[in-house]
Amino acid sequence: MSLRFIYGRAGSGKSQFCIESINTRIEKGGDKPLILIVPEQFSFQSEKNILDLIGEKSINRVKVISFKRLAYRIFDEVGGIAREHMNSSGKSMLFYHIMNTLKSEFRVFALSARQKGFVNTIADTVSEFKKYELTTEVLRDTIDEIEDEELKNKLHDLSLIYDEFNRLLYKNYIDPDDDLTILKDKIKQSTVLQGAEIWLDEFSSFIPQQYGIIEELLKKCSRVNITLTMDYDNASKDNDIFSVTQNTEKRLLKLAENNNISIEKPINLNGRPFYRFKNSPELSFLEKNLYSFPYEIYKKGPDKIEIFKTSNLYTEVEKIARNIIEFVREDNVRFSDIAVVTGDLGSYEKTVSVIFKEYRIPFFIDRNKDIEDNTLIILIKSIIDIFVKNWSYETVFRYLKTGFADIEPDEIDILENYVLAAGIKGKKKWTEEEWTYNVYGDALEGDISEESKEKLSKVNEIKNRFLRPILNFRERVLRRNNVAEICRALFEFLYDINVPEAVEKMVNEFRESGRQILANEYSQIWNIIIELMDQLVEVMGNEKVNLEQFSRILFIGIKEHKMGLIPSSLDQVLVGSIDRLKSHAIKILYIIGVNDGVFPSAAMEEGILSDRDREILNSKGVELAKDTKTQAMEQRFLVYTAITNSKEYLFLSYPIADYEGKTLRPSLIVNRVKTLFPKIVEKSDVIKIENDEESMKLISATVPTFNEMISSFRKEIDGEGEVSSIWHDVYRWYSKSDEWTGKCNNMFKAISYTNQVDYISEEKALKLYGGSLKMSVSRLEKYIECPFSYYVQYGLNIKDRKIFSLTPPDLGSFMHKVIDRFCETIKEENIDWNEVNDHICEEKIYKIVDQEIEGRGGSILNSSPRYSYIALRLKRILKRTVRIVAEQFKRGSFKPVGYEVSFENGGSYPPITVGLNDGSEVVLTGRIDRIDMMEKDGSTYIRIVDYKSGNKIFKLSDVYYGFDIQLLLYLNAILENENLDEEDKVLPGAILYFTMDDPIIKGKNNLTDEQIREEIMKSLKMKGLLLSDPDVIKEMDREMEGSSIIIPASIKKDGTLGRSSAATKEQFDILIEHVRNLVVKNCENLLMGDIRIKPYKKGKEKPCDYCMYSSICRFDTMFDGNNYRYVKEKSDEEVWKLIEREMSEEGDERGED
């Protein structure tokens, strides 16, 4: 029985020495076992290395195992485990249960127990206790010796948890963390190990459990060989980096001494050329000097070491992919000879996956996969969340879109569109016998068409099919209220919807399509779920819980579970984390993300027990895991072992920015390598160089090369430089390929693509809009704002997905309807506006609003308390509106003669007809809220009032550009169509906007009711354009003194007009003429097919800000031909001068005097 150390720095050949020693023992003969113990992640590669050397001879004599697998072998021989292991998921669920049970007894963990992730922190701490052989008895004894009150309280709580965990666990299970502790005692009984020779390789340190096993092996076996990555004499220039293994050596020597184990002369592999670096002196030099002080300088320019700086993570991985293709293609390297590692696999995993697939590089990402994103797990979470979250939209459709429900994808779309439009959410609405909500009119419309009824029938059929298994599950759960019963109900539900058969079908489909990793994942997932629930039932099956509590416990376990993945082939690039880098024959090593805080990683969090806590416990003889300072030293050692892992080539790369554009700094390792190799040239893609040589480097796999070709041609077209002739050769290759010919044709279409559409043919325009153009005035205004937006909305009839909500147009429509009904009511009841008071306003408005809501079965305004409040708010606004309207009538002589006046065939007035220059006509329709009239001195004055739910501001400048032409067109139509006696004169009185609102008045607290009323009227003053006749203006507000509080006008003391928004009769005439010219011009453009993306921009105002079609047009001033139609805000004076000049020039053209 002896102990022998095998010393050697990284790459010295320690693993190879072990394998050759085993082979020597085999050749000498004998039957004693030869056992190589390695960390779990190295076992496969080590076994392969041994097979490569010794073949299949005496293979039964050699065992390559980890400590865990050694435990299982000994248990198989001598017994020791009569119960099943509880996995990490089961333990997390158990800890959660314990934390909830004991929370009233905690001294410090009561609040922390609720924090996300705290259960896992507790689980890790208890696992640490077991690995470091800290029993509950020792923990309790230690508490009495601790003076630090905070630590004493922590240990008190941990002791409670630890005790309860062991008590509950050992009823039916055993903790995998106890295996090595049990193994230590069972080795004594083993005959398999008697006289065996052991080699321990690839360990830098051991935990107490492992030291205990090594101690027993030393007593049992003929020899124990242990490799240590360090110098032989402990006097090297970089002892600091080997402090971890030096401490391991000291502890092993002490252990041998305590057991009277002889120490053999060690093997020193540092004195000969390093095995790994026999073909690479540069890498050998790097290994010797990476952490040496003082250090040497490599005088030549290195060929086997490269540093690359990239713009971002994406271009970094692209560079590596091209480099890998080059090695495989030109240097006869196998993919399995290559490894790509990083200190931050999470940030790179998806990018590597996407780019390597594009470059057709076979790869295996070495990591344990979370199962949370598996479709079956999402299904289970969704079905529970449907009830926990009261049938929310998100949970229901997350369930449906897993693909396990008996609903086809197009049926899910139908159901989803209806649910969004009708605002279906909550158990009550989902479980209604039949849905009858109208989703095809506006949000406040209640009538249902025949077409709507047919669609509703289909929606209800889909809904009922979805509900059947869901409601069955609900009934089962309602009858069961403990963990075991809920688990049983959940399994019954999964069988009801045929999940096992569906999963099996998915596995077969994945295998047939070559997606082996997904096939492996889904072939495991069903058994994982069964195991999870079995453990949950065994541990706390009789616990009474509701669904929410059950879900929380179950998904704590699910989050903890990791699924091991198996490589689908041998010839793959290994992609992984530096701490799992397997020591196999890596010829080419890429270390990516060599950034500060990543390589080496930043300091780890202290956890529940701080560094100070660990120091105190250590002083009491309690050994625990390393503090953060020691962990930092281990990180340095990890960097050393990673960077020296390659046999032939080392590539270090780092991005200067992350995915969000935030600056990243290079690691100190980069600067260290530059210092050791002063002639190394750091390459970069930050500043791209365009020449034939660089272009050649971009030619790799077909897909990325094609993309690079497109990029090069695009740059040439954009005037960013001449394309290399190489890309013309590349194009010729692709164009001759049957697979790529079509793509080449599409490429030039894409390169020359512009989102600008200019014109469609007049023929298409006629088909879209009809031979004689008929449209509403508001639509014409939309066309003037942006032709393309009009084309998409009214030509193509593209509509946004309807969502159950109350939009401003919905509110405006509803308010107009109520105002119209109020006006008709007082007219029918012969109530004069002068008699309308607060009581009448409130009584009738409230009644009309209630009737409108009740008469619309699916009205949004009675769908929830929130919308009921909006309805109440609408009542107040509308009451205030009609009260102000009444006050306006009382103060003036104008009287209403029409409400909701329409301009259309069969309407109050005929449609507005405008002749175009080619002899055709455009027919404009529309509706105005109110027309008022007043007769004075033999003339009739017309006042048009339009109600607005938003704060509409009248600007003459907007009329000039065509953005606000409705009121003038309606006024013109009325003036032309009024049937009055020939001697009477019909004149424009005003065009006005009136805002419907219930404003909040800011002012002093001692305002009288009359003052408040006046302030409200000022706030709701009508805006628009008046006839500049003081007598007519006074008839609109007989009480005005100076400035009016109801119209935009003021009268001076001498009776003349002061500051007012007014125009003469002649100005009204030329303004109307200007508007009619705008109609002609824009309608002709429309019929000519002008659908250009040409939005206007006035200052900061532009229609794109509220346009729902921006994702279609993708307007961007960076694109060629994408320009705003800039319009300048003009003063009223400027507008009048421009219009008068235009009318004068037009008259000159017609030869008028």
From Swiss-Prot:
Its cofactor is Mg(2+); [4Fe-4S] cluster. It holds the Pfam family UvrD_C. GO terms for biological process: double-strand break repair via homologous recombination. This is ATP-dependent helicase/deoxyribonuclease subunit B. Belongs to the helicase family. AddB/RexB type 1 subfamily. [4Fe-4S] cluster binds at residues 786, 1104, 1107, 1113. The keyword Manganese does not apply. ATP binds at residues 8-15. NCBIfam families: addB_Gpos. Keywords: 4Fe-4S, ATP-binding, DNA damage, DNA repair, DNA-binding, Exonuclease, Helicase, Hydrolase, Iron, Iron-sulfur, Metal-binding, Nuclease, Nucleotide-binding. It comes from Clostridium acetobutylicum (strain ATCC 824 / DSM 792 / JCM 1419 / IAM 19013 / LMG 5710 / NBRC 13948 / NRRL B-527 / VKM B-1787 / 2291 / W). Heterodimer of AddA and AddB. The keyword Repressor does not apply. Its EC number is 3.1.-.-. The heterodimer acts as both an ATP-dependent DNA helicase and an ATP-dependent, dual-direction single-stranded exonuclease. Recognizes the chi site generating a DNA molecule suitable for the initiation of homologous recombination. The AddB subunit has 5' -> 3' nuclease activity but not helicase activity.
